[in-house]
């Protein structure tokens, strides 16, 4: 059978030609390239007497909490919270646009009985009735819609932090109300937002709206301790507009020199542009189901001006800590479903590797005092239409996250041709409005950024900032920094593998099932498997050797090795003791059902939690003790052979990776069964178990004890036609006991007959198995 190729690889993968081994050692040999390092020659290490260095403050990064500023009158910018620190009772601030918006906030100290108080607001004397029976301060927001109307109390903030906030954003005025520490925001409409000015009577701070979570934290919990000392002196607001004169914002400073070495401090203002990459994979069948929507790394190259100099930059954006979501509209073939789609949220990170062609990146090996500051950016998702054949299309829409700088490290960035010493900027995430949903489904009001359309039509997202580092470089600029180990850049091979994977996956639609069954029954050896490649016999032999070396490290080969050791230990244990416990220990080497008698009698739910491991072990046992029926590995090997013959991109370098990947990834959803008399016990990788009678195909209770006994002594059979398909076939067409038994045993001749008769249920099942053969 076709799965013979896997057994041959398992058997032969531990022996390789001596010539190939020597060749491999030679290619992986490290080489030291050195120059005369002066007084450091004896240690071969970089100098350890570092200079103190200098790191200039950035002028491009907004602080989170800017202030305090002195009381003043001004027209606030949109998208900035004004955080006012009230220190006495009376009017805190007045704000108006002289058309449809007048508001004044007055502070009332704790424990005040109802009383009329006089306040001067907008140049008028007004009398407000106030009261406060709380232990906290109250801030009454008095509002009127025109100059002729009287003020009324629109909302109240009860606070022990004595902080008040106001924001211009989205055509509305936003303030806080409620009681700390659970105060929340609310808004008021206005037709003339731009003309709103504010008179502030206390010290205040300015916070960008991108840091609204921090503003919320300050309102409810108070300012950081450092802001509550007498050493913090409020400045005039005009200080924000001072133009700082600097000799050079992008500079290289020599810190120290020793022999051939010098320390250089590099300060750079940078503009980071990046984009998200994604992959959308649609399942086969009728066109209503999607396999996955996932993030993938994306490169972006661009130019920008820095101090009048044209800079060429390259970035790679990747994500970590994604959250897996799914949607299942039903079990019918025409029900829309997405098996997995990735979303980045607060627990995720975004990495952006940055490189440019400036001096700072030429000798980035020995680096210290690496620091950076970057602005935040909001990334908003767009729409993606799931183009189903019939009916209104579901649409994934929305979602947003804000990226906040969280650290910087050194990294290596791979392009199609070279590797680049880069800086990796790490960003933490906060979710933002709007939420995302899938229209025409039950998925609504979820937060995060899904991978369906993370760029929202934008060519890139942009972040500005600054970094500084001190690098140890040769004094003579013509020298290159010593490289301790030679590194082979395999990006070209990775690109070939990516193209080959895409080609392999697209070829699934072109495989004829009747030919596949015939091919699955052939005893494929390594020569016949690889002979479809246009090459000589010598090259085929060389490729087979390369495949065996790669296959030796595969999960399948590792599992076989572990299983052999485990069974040897169990056999020796059983020979020393005839107790039930020892026998069960032998059983559990195949099933992982139990370690002792009490565990064997566990419930059905207990075994379901272990079916993934059990199914893997059942695959190994079936491979070692193969029956006459067809196995999943026969189909897997036959599909692999077919795709190798049809491929135009397969070659000596890519074949080992493809064969190894196929053994691990082809047909991930498998079912295995054990046959005893007229009863069948079936288990699959999705955590489901079945027991049923051959004659009627009616389910019976799944006996864990019986399964544990049978799995040791009975042959394991691939459930090519699983129980659900058998049941469906019997209900719609009716099958005899002999046909049912042959399908249960995965008899290839019976399978071929059903396929030749164009039986839609059997054909659909085989098609689904072929479509699972993806890399």
Swiss-Prot record:
A motif (YGL motif) lies at residues 447-449. The keyword Coiled coil applies. Residues 65-223 are annotated as: Spike head. GO terms for cellular component: host cell endoplasmic reticulum-Golgi intermediate compartment; host cell plasma membrane; host cell rough endoplasmic reticulum; host cytoskeleton; membrane; viral outer capsid. Residues 247-478 are annotated as: Spike body and stalk (antigen domain). InterPro entries: ConA-like_dom_sf, Rota_A_VP4, Rota_VP4_MID, Rota_VP4_MID_sf, VP4_concanavalin-like, VP4_helical. Keywords: Capsid protein, Coiled coil, Disulfide bond, Hemagglutinin, Host cell membrane, Host cytoplasm, Host cytoskeleton, Host endoplasmic reticulum, Host membrane, Host-virus interaction, Membrane, Outer capsid protein, Viral attachment to host cell, Viral penetration into host cytoplasm, Viral penetration via permeabilization of host membrane, Virion, Virus entry into host cell. It holds the Pfam family Rota_VP4_MID. Disulfide bonds join 317-379. Residues 388-408 are annotated as: Hydrophobic. A motif (KID motif) lies at residues 643-645. One of its GO terms (biological process) is virion attachment to host cell. Residues 483-510 form a coiled coil. A motif (DGE motif) lies at residues 307-309. The record marks 230-231, 240-241, 246-247 as: Cleavage. It comes from the Viruses. Residues 509-775 are annotated as: Spike foot. The keyword Ion transport does not apply. Belongs to the rotavirus VP4 family. This strain probably does not use sialic acid to attach to the host cell. This is Outer capsid protein VP4.
């Amino acid at each position: 059978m076709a799965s013979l190729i896997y057994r041959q690889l398992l058997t032969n993968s531990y022996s390789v030609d001596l010539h190939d081994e020597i060749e491999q050692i030679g290619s992986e040999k490290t080489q030291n390239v050195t120059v005369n390092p002066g007084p450091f020659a004896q240690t071969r290490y970089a100098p350890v007497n570092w200079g103190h260095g200098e790191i200039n403050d950035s002028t491009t990064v907004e602080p989170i909490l800017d202030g305090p500023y002195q009381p003043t009158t001004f027209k606030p910018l949109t998208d900035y919270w004004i955080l006012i620190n009230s220190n006495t009772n009376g009017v805190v601030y007045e704000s108006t646009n002289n058309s449809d918006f007048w508001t004044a906030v007055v502070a009332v100290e704790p424990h005040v009985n109802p009383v009329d108080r006089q306040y001067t607001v907008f140049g008028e004397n007004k009398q407000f009735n106030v009261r406060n029976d709380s232990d906290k301060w109250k801030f009454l927001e008095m509002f009127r819609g025109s100059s002729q109307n009287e003020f009324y109390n629109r909302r109240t903030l009860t606070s022990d932090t004595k902080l008040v906030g106001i924001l211009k954003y989205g055509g509305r005025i936003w303030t806080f109300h409620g009681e700390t520490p659970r105060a929340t925001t609310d808004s008021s409409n206005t037709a003339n937002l731009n003309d709103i000015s504010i008179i502030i009577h206390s010290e205040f701070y300015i916070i960008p709206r991108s840091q609204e979570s921090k503003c919320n934290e300050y309102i409810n919990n108070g300012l950081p301790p450092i802001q509550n000392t007498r050493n913090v002196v409020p400045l005039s607001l005009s200080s924000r507009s001072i133009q700082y004169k600097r000799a050079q914002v992008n500079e290289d400073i020599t810190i120290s020199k020793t022999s051939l070495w010098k320390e250089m401090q590099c300060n750079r203002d940078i503009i980071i542009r990046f984009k998200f990459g994604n992959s959308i994979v649609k399942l086969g069948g009728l066109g209503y189901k999607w396999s996955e929507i996932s993030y993938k790394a994306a490169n972006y190259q661009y130019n920008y001006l820095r101090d009048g100099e044209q800079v060429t930059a390259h970035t790679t954006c990747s994500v970590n800590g994604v959250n897996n979501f799914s949607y299942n509209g039903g079990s019918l073939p025409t029900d829309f479903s997405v098996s997995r789609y990735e979303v980045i949220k607060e627990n995720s990170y975004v990495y952006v590797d940055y490189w440019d062609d400036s001096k700072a990146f030429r000798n980035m090996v020995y680096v210290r005092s690496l620091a950076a500051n970057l602005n935040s950016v909001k990334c908003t998702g767009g729409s993606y239409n799931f183009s189903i054949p019939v009916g209104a299309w579901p649409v994934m829409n929305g979602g947003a996250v804000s990226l906040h700088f969280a650290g910087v490290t050194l990294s290596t960035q791979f392009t199609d041709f070279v590797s680049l010493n880069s800086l990796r900027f790490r960003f933490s995430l906060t979710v933002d409005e709007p939420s995302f949903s899938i229209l025409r489904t039950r998925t609504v009001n979820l937060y995060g950024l899904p991978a369906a359309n993370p760029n929202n039509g934008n060519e890139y997202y942009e972040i500005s900032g600054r970094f500084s580092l001190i690098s140890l470089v040769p004094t003579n600029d013509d020298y290159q920094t010593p490289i301790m180990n030679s590194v082979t850049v395999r990006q070209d091979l990775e690109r070939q593998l990516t193209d080959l994977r895409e080609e392999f996956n697209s070829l699934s639609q072109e495989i004829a099932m009747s030919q596949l069954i015939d091919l699955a029954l052939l005893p494929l050896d390594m020569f016949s498997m690889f002979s479809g490649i246009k090459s000589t016999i010598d090259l085929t032999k060389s490729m087979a050797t390369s495949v065996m070396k790669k296959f030796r490290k595969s999960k399948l080969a590792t599992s076989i090795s572990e299983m052999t050791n485990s069974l040897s230990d169990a056999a020796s244990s059983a020979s020393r003791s005839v107790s039930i416990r020892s026998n069960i220990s032998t059983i559990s080497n195949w099933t992982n059902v139990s370690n002792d008698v009490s565990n064997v009698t566990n419930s059905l739910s207990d075994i379901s939690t272990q079916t993934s491991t059990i199914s893997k072990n059942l695959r190994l046992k079936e491979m070692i003790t193969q029956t006459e029926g067809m196995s999943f590995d026969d189909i897997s090997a036959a599909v692999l052979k077919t795709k190798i013959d049809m491929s135009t991109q397969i070659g000596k370098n890519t074949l080992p990776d493809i064969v190894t990947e196929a053994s691990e990834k082809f047909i991930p959803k498998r079912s295995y069964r054990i046959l005893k008399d007229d009863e069948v016990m079936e288990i699959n990788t999705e955590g489901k178990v079945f027991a049923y009678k051959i004659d009627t195909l009616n389910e019976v209770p799944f006996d864990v004890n019986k399964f544990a006994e049978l799995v040791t002594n009975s042959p394991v059979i691939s459930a090519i036609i699983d129980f659900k398909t058998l049941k469906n076939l019997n209900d719609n067409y009716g099958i005899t006991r002999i046909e049912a038994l042959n399908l249960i045993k995965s008899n290839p001749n019976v399978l071929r007959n059903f396929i030749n008769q164009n039986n839609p249920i059997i054909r659909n099942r085989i098609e689904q198995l072929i479509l699972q053969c993806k890399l």
